[in-house]
């Protein structure tokens, strides 16, 4: 029997993976916890949101407020979806950190599996809720590029996570399906044991891909700083006349001079689309346009960058593990030859 791999191993078998995710996941969790300040809808959310974002939330959710000695406000449904996603992803960050502890997987597999199932269930709720918000938030309803980037992030998260659990599920039907994908014509217990190491490796790879994509939304806010510092020109962004009037509160006289296509006498209506310049130091609608353009660009940049980095890490990890396996096999053969 050939010797096992290097006991210290690489990647998941070392604490380096734990500390790597401690940094990434720590920021990820901190960002989402900090984001929960939005629950103060008439306070923190209104002050820190983009122009028009507060008005959109208030208008689309049927916002109700009562002025009394203690101000009370019903939180919009869309905002609850957003906050629930923040809470779920924060909890998932902590669970993911625990899953990187080698001793937990080796000595307490039942706990590792239980935490993994909790991660799967929570992300099953968190990713769709994020997609639902993305359909409308950040101007996605008027800008397909923004909507596609955020929805693609959610869909990839769900697909990668589902694939990672397919690789290690003990369900009989799914296990037979997995073995058939390996090429086993009549799957049995021996086939299950034969492909076990491959399944575990693939499970780890898809979990890494899941975490890389899952953190896209939080890290896009970091990448958004780049065009701000570099003072990049982000072109023009599509706005509906209804958004300019209802969310940004632009008056008829301003529309007539700046966006004449919105005027009724020119055939304009609430659904008419106009191009608004994205300018960080411009007017209210230009600042909002800059935010929407920047968020769309940051989401695409974060998604592509995280996917590339994840694939590089997975490829390097696989290559080095194979190299160690070959080295171990050669050493074992040398020992066998010398012992004869």
Swiss-Prot record:
It comes from the Eukaryota. The chain crosses the membrane at residues 15-35, 81-101, 118-138, 148-168, 219-239, 315-335. It is a multi-pass membrane protein. The keyword Transcription regulation does not apply. Its main location: membrane. GO terms for cellular component: membrane. It comes from Aspergillus versicolor. It is found in: Membrane. Keywords: Glycoprotein, Membrane, Transmembrane, Transmembrane helix. This is Ava biosynthesis cluster protein G. Glycans are attached at residue 171. Pathway: Secondary metabolite biosynthesis. Part of the cluster that mediates the biosynthesis of a highly modified cyclo-arginine-tryptophan dipeptide (cRW). The first step of the pathway is perfornmed by the arginine-containing cyclodipeptide synthase (RCPDS) avaA that acts as the scaffold-generating enzyme and is responsible for formation of the cyclo-Arg-Trp (cRW) diketopiperazine. AvaB then acts as a multifunctional flavoenzyme that is responsible for generating the cyclo-Arg-formylkynurenine DKP, which can be deformylated by avaC. AvaB then further catalyzes an additional N-oxidation followed by cyclization and dehydration.
């Amino acid at each position: 029997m050939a010797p096992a791999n290097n006991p210290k191993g690489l990647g998941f078998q070392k604490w380096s993976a734990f500390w790597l995710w401690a940094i990434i996941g720590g920021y990820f969790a901190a960002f989402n916890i900090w984001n929960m300040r939005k629950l103060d809808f008439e306070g923190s959310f209104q002050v820190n949101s983009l122009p028009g974002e507060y008005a959109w939330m208030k208008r689309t959710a049927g916002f109700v407020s009562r002025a009394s000695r203690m101000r009370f406000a019903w939180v919009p449904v869309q905002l609850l979806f957003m906050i629930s996603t923040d809470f779920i992803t924060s909890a998932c960050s902590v669970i993911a950190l625990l899953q990187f502890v080698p001793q937990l997987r080796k000595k307490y597999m039942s706990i590792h599996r239980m935490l993994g199932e909790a991660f799967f269930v929570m992300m099953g709720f968190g990713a769709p809720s994020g997609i639902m918000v993305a359909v409308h938030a950040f101007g996605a309803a008027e800008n397909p590029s923004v909507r596609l980037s955020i929805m693609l992030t959610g869909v990839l998260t769900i697909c990668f996570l589902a694939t990672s659990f397919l690789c290690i599920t003990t369900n009989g039907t799914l296990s037979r399906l997995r073995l058939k994908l390996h090429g086993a014509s009549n799957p049995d217990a021996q086939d299950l044991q034969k492909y076990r190491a491959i399944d575990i490796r693939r499970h780890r790879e898809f979990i890494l891909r899941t975490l890389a994509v899952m953190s896209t939304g939080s890290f896009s806010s970091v990448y958004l700083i780049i065009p701000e510092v570099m003072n990049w020109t982000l072109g023009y962004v599509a706005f509906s006349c209804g958004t300019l009037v209802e969310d940004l509160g632009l008056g008829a006289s301003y529309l007539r001079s700046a966006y004449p296509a919105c005027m009724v006498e020119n055939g304009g209506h609430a659904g008419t689309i106009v191009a608004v310049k994205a300018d960080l130091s411009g007017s209210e609608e230009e600042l909002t346009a800059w935010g929407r353009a920047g968020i769309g660009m940051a989401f695409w940049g974060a998604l592509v960058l995280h996917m590339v980095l994840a694939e590089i890490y997975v490829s390097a990890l696989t290559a080095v593990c194979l190299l160690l396996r070959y080295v171990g096999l050669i050493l074992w053969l040398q020992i066998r030859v010398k012992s004869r």
